[in-house]
């Protein structure tokens, strides 16, 4: 019972932080709508609709798969295998997110013309594609820290990510975009991308500081595919239904 209490309290902490971030994010969106107007908000929503689908496809179930594989190794007291787990998950994530990002970057003009119906979103979609692999790799590290029960650390990084996104977005809006809808949309995507870079850097640095033992290479690929591919398929189908 004593061991379960920290897990319970950390789960409460993560839930509370997520609720707080949602409240802050909603308030920030309301403030943005006043700054950039209805046209800017409409453009942002169009980009985020396509971006969310691309993100789901790029993540390809890797966050949950990383969490599952990490928890399995820790449960069997094999911390020496964590380096191989993370390296394989990183390779999978880079392959999937890189493929999706390339398709989004090259296909942005076609999507803007034939699907979205607004060519102003092309620069924002391409900028989103540039940052997409970073966002997906952050999902790998988030899954690892969740499985390792380092919820407090993850919550602190998520708060810092939200604050960084807001600061970068507001600074670029006031210094460059003004009331221009296309530039405002770019600022929002830039804020999210920069904050994802900060998050990935922080989580990788914290992981390196752990200095866990390294063991012999183990077969991870099949286990990863069995965990990630079904999740990826279900997530993509659900996201396609909600987007269309």
Regions found by a protein language model. Give the residues of each.
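Hydrophobic alpha-helical transmembrane segments
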Residues: 156-171, 179-209
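Alpha-helical transmembrane segments of multi-pass membrane proteins
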Residues: 102, 106, 117-141, 167
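N-terminal membrane topogenesis motif
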Residues: 1-24, 80-87, 218-234
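Interfacial/gating helices of multi-pass transporter permease domains
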Residues: 32-53, 120, 185-186, 223-227
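Small-residue-rich midsections of specific transmembrane alpha-helices
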Residues: 45-74, 89, 93, 100, ...
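Transmembrane-helix boundary and interhelical linker motifs in polytopic inner-membrane proteins
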Residues: 5, 37-40, 54-91, 146-153
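Membrane-interface junctions at transmembrane-helix termini in multi-pass inner-membrane proteins
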Residues: 134-157
């Amino acid at each position: 019972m004593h061991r379960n209490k920290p897990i319970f309290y950390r789960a409460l902490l993560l839930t509370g932080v997520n609720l707080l971030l949602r409240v802050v994010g909603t308030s920030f969106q309301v403030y943005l709508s006043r700054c950039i107007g209805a046209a800017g908000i409409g453009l942002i929503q169009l980009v985020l609709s396509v971006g969310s689908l691309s993100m789901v496809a790029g993540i390809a179930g890797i966050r949950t798969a990383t969490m599952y594989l990490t928890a399995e190794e820790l449960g069997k007291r094999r911390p020496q295998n964590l380096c191989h787990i993370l390296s394989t998950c990183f390779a999978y994530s880079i392959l999937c997110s890189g493929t999706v990002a390339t398709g989004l970057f090259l296909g942005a003009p076609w999507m803007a013309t034939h699907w979205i119906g607004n060519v102003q979103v092309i620069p924002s979609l391409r900028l989103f594609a540039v940052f997409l692999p970073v966002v997906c790799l952050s999902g790998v590290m988030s899954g690892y820290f969740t499985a390792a029960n380092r919820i407090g650390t993850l919550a602190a990084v998520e708060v810092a990510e939200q604050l960084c996104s807001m600061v970068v977005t507001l600074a670029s809006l006031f210094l460059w975009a003004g009331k221009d809808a296309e530039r405002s949309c770019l600022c929002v995507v830039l804020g999210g991308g920069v904050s994802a870079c900060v998050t990935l850097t922080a989580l990788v640095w914290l992981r390196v500081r752990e200095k866990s033992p390294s063991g012999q290479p183990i077969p991870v690929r099949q286990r990863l595919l069995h965990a990630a591919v079904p999740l990826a398929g279900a997530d993509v189908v659900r996201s396609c239904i909600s987007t269309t």
